[in-house]
Amino acid sequence: MSKKCQLTGKVANNGYAVSHSHKRTKKLQNVNLQYKKVWSTEQNKWIKMLISTKAIKTLTKAL
């Protein structure tokens, strides 16, 4: 399973976890990916896609 949004192409973000004493350790911020069935008008059927929650929110706003 790829950790990439099939609709927007979003991938994980590299960052730092900063402690109280300001020690920095590398941290990976993953994308919130969910499986969602999306209706395809071209193929005239449901397609199961792995998309980010932001993409789901955008799709529901468009409808």
UniProtKB/Swiss-Prot annotation:
Domain of life of the native organism: Eukaryota
A Pfam family it matches: Ribosomal_L28
Coiled-coil annotated residue ranges, if any: none
InterPro entries per UniProt: Ribosomal_bL28, Ribosomal_bL28/bL31-like_sf, Ribosomal_bL28_bact-type, Ribosomal_bL28_sf
Keyword presence, Kinase: no
Residues annotated as transmembrane: none
Similarity comment: Belongs to the bacterial ribosomal protein bL28 family.
Molecular-function GO term, any one: structural constituent of ribosome
GO annotation, cellular component aspect: chloroplast; ribonucleoprotein complex; ribosome
Keyword vocabulary terms for this entry: Chloroplast, Plastid, Ribonucleoprotein, Ribosomal protein
Location of the protein in the cell: Plastid, Chloroplast
Species in which this protein is naturally found: Porphyra purpurea
Protein name as it appears in the record: Large ribosomal subunit protein bL28c
Keyword match Repressor: no
Biological process (GO), any one: translation
